[in-house]
Amino acid sequence: MKKIIGLVLSLTIIAGVCAAVLAYVDSITRDPIAQMKVKQEQAAVKAVLPADVTEVVPADGFYVGMDKADKILGYAAKGTDANGYGGDIVLMVGFKQDKKTIVCYRTLVAAETPGLGMKLKTPEFADQFGGKDGTSLAVTKDGGKIEAITSATITSRAVCRAIADAQKKIK
């Protein structure tokens, strides 16, 4: 009986120390991680807006890109689709003044298969979205004009849905 009590006590102490270490590491890394995510999002916003944007103004769930004369040149919004092959796909998508025509997108979050689904980050895949209407995207297998990533149709469809989600936010 004493042996069992000793084992339980030892395990409790070890678990308590581990919990304290994890809590400490979380407390010192939480702010830097949050700051990094903000910087990543800000960089993505600048990357997806038209090149002549000089000022970015946050709006209600999206960003407005303007020139020096305060003329609106484009919009950026975050779009999400939970049905990627590896889970959530989160994109920052840029649109022209008409709020429909895609400038480009940048991937914020994706856990797709390396070498297949992660090709959503490559220019070969991403560039085909530029100039297209964000309200009517579909892969060729579904009657659309987007060439799906070979062996990663689920990911390609999720990108189309994430872009549509972003487009809805700027209406």
State where each predicted segment sits:
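Flexible, solvent-exposed loop/hinge segments and secondary-structure transition points
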Residues: 2-171
